[in-house]
Amino acid sequence: TSLYDYFGNIVYTFDLKMAIEQGFLTPYYYHPEPVYLTEEEFDEYIDLTNKLTKLHPKEDEPISEVALRIAIKRTRVQNNSIAKLDWLDKHLVESDGIHHTIFYSGDKIFSQVLSLLGVEKHLILHQFTHKENMAKRSRLLEAFARGDLQALVAMKCLDEGVDVPPTETAYFLASSSVSREFVQRRGRILRNWPGKKNANVIDLISIPPERFIHLGKSSEEYRIVRSAIRREYLRVKEFSELAINKY
């Protein structure tokens, strides 16, 4: 391309692994947590996958605008699974030990996540979304850094160039259909901060209902969603490879 012709070949890259090893980013523990889609959610997921396959049969080819909208809609099914609320309710028992924590939520369950964490779990928190202007965001980040806020419940903001270096724990209820965006989200919470030795990433991964596992690889449903499941697996693998607790 003209850019490569002008600047020449890339002779040096500085990736996430190097940034962590050289101390520019904080090391992290990675905890993938599978949660099962409901039957209704899975039916919608299957339907969208069928439509996407017809519109975009070859993954290595450019995706059309219509197919992209369907892919995003399918990702939203995973991001907004009701099972993620159940998981939070079950696993966040004591609120006293929670601090400098971000919950990255899907849009449809966002208000329910706020209610669960703020009302039922009694966390001192605030939403952190596109609705907050830059001045408000700045005040919230300052309160978060001081510890006045235990948590921020975020939606999309980590895709908009917002770094949150005081973050020590991040719950990813929502992933992204774009790999680059998800890598950026991880990088934004790994920024160094005084006293921050490591970070924890808890990744809630939506998978097909439990009965799907018992159907085996020969089932029609497995064939339909195989590529999507593989993408989730590759994301988990990538995140795990750079984690302290690599497995």
Say what each PLM segment does:
Residues 1, 18-21, 34-39, 108-109, ...:
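Conserved nucleotide-binding/hydrolysis micro-motifs of P-loop NTPases
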Residues 151-155, 159-176, 181-184, 198-204:
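A short beta-strand element within the Helicase C-terminal
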Residues 31-42, 46-115:
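Conserved strand-helix element at the start of the C-terminal RecA-like helicase core
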Residues 1-2, 132-140, 179-186:
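Short, charged, surface-exposed secondary-structure boundary motifs
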